[in-house]
Amino acid sequence: GPGYLDGRPGNFTLRAVYSYNRFRGRAPGAWDILLKEAQEEVKELFAFATVPALAKDYINPNLPKQYGQLGGVELIAYRSYLEFMAERYHTSEGFLIKLNGKSKAYGLRTGDTLKVPNIAPFRIEDISVGRMHKEDEQLSKHNIVIDTKNKQIFVYDPSQPTIVIPGMAMVVSDEDQEPLGKMIAMFPTTTGGEQFIHHGVWKVVNCVEFPSWRYDKQFLETGKRGTDVVDVAHGPNSPVGVLWCGLSKSGIGIHGTSSPSTIGRSQSAGCYRLSNWDAARFPQYVRPGAKVIVR
């Protein structure tokens, strides 16, 4: 994935192109054939979408902005219909304002129509509180590589042979002692600062939708657990977003986010953040038992 859609090319667009071409067995910079495929697949860049009635169940304009004030809030919801629609269509509030104008964007209500990127929507209504994704005979064997330098998460299928093509190092270096298999997915990610990165080999131990979260200011700042904590409920604007995949390294996981536009552009306290639309798709590729290599 290229990250959130803003109508402009950037580093994550390039990395998405390189990864897709690699998946197809082509040189990373094979733009001509990629553009032809894209134009055949997506006839129109934009579409018109209606704000669904169910959106009102996920909006709380009075949601506190400070983590320490979220205790007791039942749902960590979106703060506006604009935010709901931006995440639903993999973009930013600013880009929807650019496409539709401030008056329309800020005045959104259920039933209103909005110009959006032409992409399959992220359906928050399909996420269930506490739903666990269990081990899977195939998906639990997949390998994950977290490239902390380039801020990407790669998923490999060892049942498919590795495709060796010129320029693979432009995506991620292959220095493993054993073959990882074919690269089948790439997600942009936010990683921690160097002091919080735990290089090595781990495993996915659990994967749960709409997780609750414990705000521990001391742990986020130092990596050591404190006693002054706040229990935070689930929701799309929870700091861990719509999914938590815990690793065998205690306290560390791959999870969603409350701020998709910062993915790959900020730092975490040690975990690996995905946009909520990518986090929702993650269990289609990975289940508990999968190996995780942090580079």
Model-derived regions: residue spans:
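Exported/periplasmic cell-wall-interacting domains
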Residues: 103, 217-295
